[in-house]
Every structure is written in C-alpha cells, then in structure tokens.
C-alpha cells in the first residue's frame, strides 16, 4: 500500500480570484464543471497504452463524482500535449473546457512509472496544481486515482475518495447460492474473492487501516466465528467464538477496541471488546434488541438502534455506555446507523409501511439533532435499500439495493452510491449479486 511515492512539482496558485469558485458539494445541485483530460505524453508505445488508460481512469473518476463533465477528446482543437508547454487557452475555452489536465508517463530505469500532471484554469490562464507520482507498473490505476483525488480536492476543498477499496458480500445468481467475501476498487475494478464460499459469511468490516478486514462466518448454523484476514499476506485467524453474534464488529478510531451486538437470554446487547485482551464489556442493559453499533470519529460516542420503546429507533451513548439519548423520532423503524467520518451526519436505513406495503429508505440526520429538530433527510428509497456506509470524506454514501423476484426472474441485489445531497445515484458494477458494502479509508 506504500508503494506510491509523491514528489510535489508545484501547487502554485490559490483559489483567490478563481473564476469557477470552489464547488459546494453539500448544498443543492450544481451543473458539473467541464474539464478536458488531455492525452498523456509517453516515450514508448507501451507507455502510451498506460497513459491512455490513466486518462480513462481519471476521466471516469471525475465523471462518477457528478461534479465534473469530461469533454470528449474528439472535440479537442489544440494538438500539443504534455507538461512542457503552456496551453493555448483560447482553444480550450472554445470547446467550453473550464479546466484542463495535461500529463505524461515515463518508465524509469528502476522499472517504475513516473506519472506527471498539471491542472490548468483555462479562464484565468493559470496553473492550479501539479505533481509527479512514482509507482510500480502494476499500480498505474492507483496512481490515476491519486491524480483524480488531487483534482477533486483542489476544486472542491474536500479530500478525494477515489483511491479506496470496497469489501462486500458477493452472492452467486445461480443455485445453489454461494456467498463469498469480495474486495474491489471503489469503482468496481479489480474484483477478487477473499473466501471460498463453503460457509455462510456476513458483514465484512475494514479494520482501522485498509490492510485487514473482519467478518462473521457460520461454521455451523449455530456457531458464529469472527475472522480477521490480513489482505497483504492472506493470513486468516479467529478473533473470537461469539455465540449469538449477528454482525461483524465495528472498530474504534484508534483500532484498540471494537463494538458488536450479541444475543443472550432473550435479549440482544451491545458489547465492547478490547482487541488486545479479548475482554468483553457490556454497554447496554434492560430488555429488547440493541444492534448495529457504530463509533463516532473521535471514538467518544456510539450510535446504535434499539427497540426498547417498542419500535427500533436510533440512540447515542458515550463509549462507556453512559448518557443514552434517543435521536430519531419519525414514523417507521430505524436500523443500521453509520457515523460519517466527518462527524456531522449519521446515515441510517428507515422502514416505513403504507397501503402498498413496506418501503425501505436511506436517510441522514445530524449527529446532534437537538440543534435542529428537522434534521432528518431521506436521500433514496426503494423496495430494498439498506446497509449505508460512507466514503472517507463523508460526501458519498454506498448502500445495497434489492429488487423482488418476478415470474421466471429471480430477485437481485446490487451496490449503489449516492451523493450526500440525494443526487447522482449510480450502480457500482459487480460480477454477481452484492450486499453489505463497507468503504475503506484512502489507501496509503
């Protein structure tokens, strides 16, 4: 994960006076900014192929964000490429490109790739950003994601999220159904399976770093084991044999503890485990079902859902179990809360019932709802939408979406992403059905 090394080339100009202004990605919906990602120069035909692929990945990343509109290269007027010259800005303005990316790819004697780029503002005719990245040849895609991250951050003011991974549960579409833990890039590329499908697996979670995952596996129908898998070495070990567990643990920001729900004696409660000593500490009490705990980014609070008042609602407590407060008050059942990495919002699944039956909704609410009684906002709904998780910059939510079975057509489940605003919903393509997504932090 540490194979990409950065060398700052130039970050010469601030946004003061920048004609496009910083894009606000939280409020409302703005037209995407037109950007031209020019051909990356290369010294050889092999490097030229890599350069072509890098341009495709950068363009796709920016397009998927919904904030940029890559312009087709067929409309480019200027024929010069590379980073050694100053662009003919009038030619780019003529095709309505507000931003321009030029770059080059070179293979070093070490065998690594050196990939350079410059981001230009064609309206003010100024350079906005530029970097040189070195990466092993097989990590060219990650280098492209890093470049897109830098462009996204420069224009929006928020960190990018393109150089990330998604772990999820893959399920075969044919009988017998086989469930496996799978790993892929955030955009669906580089999909690979981490388990063999011989046992039921559920709720994969990333550890504090993206180098390890944890998941629940049922060796038998009544015996649930929590496994830890090292993604670098492939080594797997049992964290614990927790009778009654239904979801994998979620980890504290410092990586020392984890929270999980365990059913015992007719009730389900939240427990915290010290990962070093494996000692369990019960955080909730009374009767009822308390599930789906999630830490706040600072580790001081835990959000979870509980039916202690008859219908599942969301609650927040201190990480030691004290000062319990209910935070959801709308009609319906609330489940699967997930705290934004920014700390400002909590995503959730809400189930409502009407004349046509149940409707599933993905929503967000402020983490301190007492500051705004109308803080809840539904961002998407459907037959089955569940398991929301956040991008590392807290601006995009990924979730599982399902459709019912029809005559001669089985139901299906896929992974989708949607912006915090409720716009730009898009499917993340997977080779089979998919559910229970979990988003990593930005890779090192």
Swiss-Prot record:
Signal peptide residues on this chain, from the entry's feature table: 1-19
Listed GO CC annotations: periplasmic space
Signal recorded as keyword: yes
InterPro entries in UniProt: 6-blade_b-propeller_TolB-like, PD40, Tol-Pal_TolB, TolB_N
Pfam families in UniProt: PD40, TolB_N
Primary location: periplasm
The entry's keywords: Cell cycle, Cell division, Periplasm, Signal
Chain segments annotated as coiled-coil in the UniProt record: none
Compartments where found: Periplasm
GO biological process: cell division; protein import
Superkingdom in the source lineage: Bacteria
Subunit structure: The Tol-Pal system is composed of five core proteins: the inner membrane proteins TolA, TolQ and TolR, the periplasmic protein TolB and the outer membrane protein Pal. They form a network linking the inner and outer membranes and the peptidoglycan layer.
PANTHER family: PROTEIN TOLB (PTHR36842:SF1), PROTEIN TOLB HOMOLOG (PTHR36842)
Family per similarity comment: Belongs to the TolB family.
Record's function text: Part of the Tol-Pal system, which plays a role in outer membrane invagination during cell division and is important for maintaining outer membrane integrity.
Protein name: Tol-Pal system protein TolB
The species this protein was found in: Rickettsia felis (strain ATCC VR-1525 / URRWXCal2)
Gene expressing this chain: tolB
């Amino acid at each position: 994960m540490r194979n990409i090394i950065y060398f700052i080339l130039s970050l010469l100009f601030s946004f003061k006076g920048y004609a496009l202004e910083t894009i606000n990605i939280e409020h409302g919906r703005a037209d995407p900014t037109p950007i031209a990602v020019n051909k990356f120069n290369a010294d050889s035909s092999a490097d030229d192929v890599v350069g072509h692929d890098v341009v495709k990945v950068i363009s796709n990343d920016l397009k998927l964000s919904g904030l940029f509109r890559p312009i087709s290269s067929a409309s480019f007027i200027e024929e010069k490429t590379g980073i050694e010259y100053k662009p003919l800005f009038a030619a780019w303005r003529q095709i309505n490109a507000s931003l321009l990316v030029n770059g080059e790819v070179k293979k070093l004697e070490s065998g690594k790739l050196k990939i350079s780029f410059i981001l230009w503002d064609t309206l003010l005719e100024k350079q906005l950003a530029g970097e040189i990245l070195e990466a092993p040849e097989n990590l060219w895609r990650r280098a492209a994601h890093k470049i897109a991250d830098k462009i996204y951050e420069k224009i929006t003011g928020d960190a990018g999220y393109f150089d990330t991974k998604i772990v999820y549960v893959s399920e075969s579409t044919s009988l017998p159904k086989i469930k496996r833990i799978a790993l892929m890039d955030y955009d669906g590329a580089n999909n690979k399976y981490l388990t063999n499908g011989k046992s039921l697996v559920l709720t994969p979670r990333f550890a504090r770093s993206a180098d390890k995952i944890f998941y629940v596996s049922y060796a038998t129908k009544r015996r649930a084991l929590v496994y830890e898998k090292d993604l670098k070495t492939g080594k797997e070990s049992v964290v614990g044999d927790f009778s009654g567990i239904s979801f994998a643990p979620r980890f504290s920001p410092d990586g020392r503890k984890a929270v999980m729900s365990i059913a015992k004696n007719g009730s389900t409660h939240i427990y915290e485990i010290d990962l070093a000593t494996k000692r369990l500490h019960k955080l909730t009490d009374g009767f009822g079902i308390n599930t789906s705990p999630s830490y706040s980014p600072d580790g001081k609070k835990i959000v979870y859902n509980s039916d202690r008042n008859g219908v599942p609602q969301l609650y927040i407590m201190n990480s030691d179990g004290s000062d319990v407060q209910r935070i959801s008050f709308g009609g319906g059942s609330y489940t699967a809360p997930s705290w934004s990495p920014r700390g400002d919002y909590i995503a959730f699944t809400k189930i409502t019932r009407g004349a046509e039956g149940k409707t599933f909704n993905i929503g967000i609410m402020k983490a301190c709802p007492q500051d705004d009684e109308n803080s809840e906002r539904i961002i998407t709904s459907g037959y089955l939408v569940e398991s929301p998780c956040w991008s590392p910059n807290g601006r995009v939510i990924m979730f599982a979406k399902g459709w019912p079975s029809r005559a001669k057509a089985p139901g299906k489940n896929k992974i989708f992403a949607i912006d915090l605003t409720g716009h730009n919903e898009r499917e993340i393509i997977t080779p089979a059905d998919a559910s229970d997504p979990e988003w990593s932090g930005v890779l090192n």
